[in-house]
Each structure stands twice: as structure tokens, then as C-alpha cells.
Amino acid sequence: MAQQGRNRSSNQLLVAGAAQAIDQMKFEIAQEFGVTLGADTTSRANGSVGGEITKRLVSLAQQQLGGGTSF
């Protein structure tokens, strides 16, 4: 079922230039986790990197909004 009022993809970046920062974060986290990103890597390994990116971005947003909660 199509959703009304949505005219953009959910993975479209809202801030110009954010793609480079997100990619840098992705590669840094993959290196920390010992994951080689790519088609030959398991979904679980790739997903762990994506999950960590989400955690860190939420933490950054909370700090900027004054929540101060960190993971």
C-alpha cells in the first residue's frame, strides 16, 4: 500500500555533503569491528556496522539537543 504525502526515499540524505561524513563513519566503524564491507560480507556483519552508525548518530543528536545521553 502506497503512503500518501511521501515524496522522497527514506534513505535520501537531508543535509548536502553528509554522504562523505556517513561513508567515513561507516569505514571507521567497520575497521573497529574488523569487518570488510562488501558483497562477500555477511548481512549480519554489514548490519552490525549500520546499527552502530545509527547508535552513534542518535547519540550525537541527543547531545546536540541537550539530552547528553551517550551509548
UniProtKB/Swiss-Prot annotation:
Site label Cleavage, positions: 28-29
Record bears the keyword DNA-binding: yes
Keywords assigned: DNA-binding, Sporulation
GO biological process: DNA topological change; sporulation resulting in formation of a cellular spore
Family to which this protein belongs: Belongs to the alpha/beta-type SASP family.
Additional notes on this entry: SASP are degraded in the first minutes of spore germination and provide amino acids for both new protein synthesis and metabolism.
InterPro entries: SASP_alpha/beta-type (IPR001448), SASP_alpha/beta-type_CS (IPR018126), SASP_DNA-binding (IPR050847), SASP_sf_alpha/beta (IPR038300)
Species of origin: Laceyella sacchari
Protein name, UniProt field: Small, acid-soluble spore protein 1
Domain of life: Bacteria
Keyword hit for DNA-binding: yes
Entry GO MF terms: double-stranded DNA binding
Record Pfam families: SASP (PF00269)
Physiological role: SASP are bound to spore DNA. They are double-stranded DNA-binding proteins that cause DNA to change to an a-like conformation. They protect the DNA backbone from chemical and enzymatic cleavage and are thus involved in dormant spore's high resistance to UV light.
